[in-house]
Each structure stands twice: as C-alpha cells, then as structure tokens.
Amino acid sequence: MSFSAPGKIVQEYTIRNNRLGMVAFGDVRRPVFLDLVPDAHVGDYVRVHVGFAIEHITAEEAHGPDC
C-alpha cells in the first residue's frame, strides 16, 4: 500500500528533458514530475506519490464524494 495525494497542475515546464509541473495541494505548491501522466496538463488533477504524478484523475475524484 502507498500514500498518494491529489493535486491540481498549475504550471508546466521542462528541465533536462524531464516534464515537470507545479502542483497545488490546497495552499501548498510543490514541483512534481509529470512524465508518467503524458495526458495531464495545466488545470488537470493528478495523484502524486513521492514527487511523481502517478495517475490523471477527475476533479470529482480529487475533491472526494463529500465536497
């Protein structure tokens, strides 16, 4: 089992042929590798595990059923 957190991509950029994005987790923003989710772009939501976006998700999945 692993822990992943949902976040929203707010910026995309490339460093040394790696695709990265600034991902917002509420008020906190962190750089995240986006290479594993090539279909995710600014405005999309992803699940992040140890600095890597591992899954492209919907806004409903990101906010949960109670939001």
State where each predicted segment sits:
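Short, conserved beta-turn/loop elements at beta-strand boundaries and strand-helix junctions
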Residues: E12-N17
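Short, compositionally biased
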Residues: H56-C67
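Short, acidic/hydrophobic/Gly-rich beta-strand patch recurrent on exposed beta strands
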Residues: L20-F25, F33
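Short, surface-exposed secondary-structure boundary micro-motifs
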Residues: G51-F52
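Conserved hydrophobic positions within beta-strands
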Residues: G7-I9, V23
